[in-house]
């Protein structure tokens, strides 16, 4: 007899598709950037401004989007957000000036800003504790897969029609996902007609949990105390990630001499390495937890190894003269960087439980702030020095600081547990 696919895994599949599409819409501007820059006559500083315009509302929407998901449910919130970013992507194809580009990237940031915290809130009630690392890992691996296929997809559409048409097509795909999500997703398992009593037991969901959470007051002070260090580490992680998402195609073209045809392959390689890292990081963390029962070790070990490993490969990349070797080192660095992503997104679930949407938004504010600063600083330093070396060195330094800070993160210090009893709650999970 054929085994029935669990509803939670189908929900996970829908979320994977959202992460995949969201990253295509986020990264497409960097792939089209050389053509946009040529058509509109933009400087590197102006291009950096276009890149960073996304990050300001993205950061601002993190906590707000997560809080709205906690209060109003992830279904309504994510439908509105995906409509906003889908329309913004379509309209980018009609932009005629740098100002319009900045405005539309800003609107895109509003739409995408609350999406991942909202998804994290959904996982609180749809995914059991032992599957959360995998869920965060696989969704973010689909995000990186979206980023990895963006160069060839965008360049194929560009070759056939133009860069404007690429944004119109990709925006239409985003709006199509909104329809799928609105049809299939429910805020909690007990509301879904396909979920069996056995699966409810496997998930560990109790009837009324989501309604009680919506009525509960948000413990802002305790959330901040538990999440500020996670937010800082996410900033250190995000600084380097934004470099990959915004400047990688320009770096490979201008500093390493790859032509447009080669860019499709060599831009995708580091991002594909990230796909593997994302998935493996979540699986490793879950496996360590299942074998040891030590949640702090399961999260902390993967965080430290990922950030330190990324630094280990980004440092020699700046000194190698061979372009292919540089891509290999970038790919290895990005693989280790992405090992940390699933763990970072699992921490709000571990620490905050029913407030995971707000906590996830709080954490990802660090990522958003990095997105405000990193692309602009990167572009400014390139313009001032004529080289990409110093910006990459700054990224490496932040990876080192983040690795050290990760050693002090303790997911056993939950929002509901007093500090003095943290040592007694080794197995306590939300």
From Swiss-Prot:
It comes from the Bacteria. GO terms for molecular function: transmembrane transporter activity. May transport sulfoacetate into the cell. It comes from Cupriavidus necator (strain ATCC 17699 / DSM 428 / KCTC 22496 / NCIMB 10442 / H16 / Stanier 337). Disruption phenotype: Mutants do not grow with sulfoacetate, but can use acetate, taurine, isethionate and sulfoacetaldehyde. Mutants are also unable to induce expression of the sau cluster. PROSITE patterns: MFS. PANTHER family: FI19708P1-RELATED, SOLUTE CARRIER FAMILY 17. Belongs to the major facilitator superfamily. It is found in: Cell membrane. Keywords: Cell membrane, Membrane, Transmembrane, Transmembrane helix, Transport. Gene3D superfamilies: MFS general substrate transporter like domains. GO terms for cellular component: plasma membrane. The chain crosses the membrane at residues 47-67, 83-103, 142-162, 165-185, 228-248, 263-283, 301-321, 327-347, 362-382, 390-410. Induction: Induced by sulfoacetate. This is Probable sulfoacetate transporter SauU. It is a multi-pass membrane protein.
């Amino acid at each position: 007899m054929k085994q029935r696919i669990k509803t939670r895994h189908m929900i996970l599949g829908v979320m994977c598709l959202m992460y995949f599409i969201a990253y295509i819409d986020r990264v497409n501007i960097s792939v089209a950037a050389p053509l946009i820059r040529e058509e509109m006559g933009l400087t590197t500083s102006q291009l950096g401004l276009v890149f960073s315009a996304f990050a300001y509302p993205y950061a601002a929407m993190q906590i707000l989007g997560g809080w709205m998901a906690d209060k109003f449910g992830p279904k309504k919130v994510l439908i509105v957000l995906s409509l906003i970013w889908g329309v913004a992507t379509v309209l980018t194809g009609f932009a005629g000036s740098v100002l319009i580009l900045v405005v539309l990237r800003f609107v895109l940031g509003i739409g995408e800003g609350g999406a991942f915290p909202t998804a994290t809130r959904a996982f609180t009630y749809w995914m059991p504790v032992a599957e959360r690392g995998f869920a965060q890992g696989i969704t973010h691996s689909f995000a990186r897969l979206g980023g990895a296929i963006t160069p060839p997809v965008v360049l194929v559409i560009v070759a056939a029609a133009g860069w404007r048409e690429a944004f119109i097509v990709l925006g239409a795909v985003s709006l199509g996902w909104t329809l799928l999500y609105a049809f299939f997703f429910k805020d909690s398992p007990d509301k879904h007609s396909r979920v069996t009593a056995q699966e409810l037991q496997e998930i560990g969901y109790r009837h009324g949990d989501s309604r009680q959470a919506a009525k509960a007051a948000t413990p802002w002070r305790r959330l901040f105390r538990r999440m500020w260090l996670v937010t800082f580490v996410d900033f250190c992680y995000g600084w380097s990630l934004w470099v990959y998402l915004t400047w990688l195609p320009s770096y490979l073209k201008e500093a390493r001499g790859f032509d447009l045809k080669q860019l499709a392959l060599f831009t995708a390689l580091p991002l594909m390495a990230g796909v593997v890292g994302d998935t493996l990081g979540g699986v490793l963390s879950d496996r360590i937890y299942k074998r040891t029962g030590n949640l702090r070790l399961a999260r902390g070990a993967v965080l430290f190894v990922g950030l330190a490993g990324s630094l280990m490969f980004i440092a020699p990349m700046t000194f190698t003269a061979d372009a292919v070797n540089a891509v290999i080192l970038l790919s290895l660095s990005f693989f280790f960087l992405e090992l940390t992503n699933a763990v970072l997104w699992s921490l709000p679930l571990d620490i905050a439980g029913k407030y995971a949407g707000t906590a996830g938004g709080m954490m990802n504010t660090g990522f958003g702030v990095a997105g405000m600063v990193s692309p602009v600083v990167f572009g400014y330093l390139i313009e001032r020095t004529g080289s990409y070396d110093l910006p990459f060195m700054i990224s490496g330094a932040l990876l080192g600081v983040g690795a050290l800070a990760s050693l002090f993160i303790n997911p056993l210090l939950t929002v509901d547990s007093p500090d003095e009893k943290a040592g007694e709650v080794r197995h306590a999970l939300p």
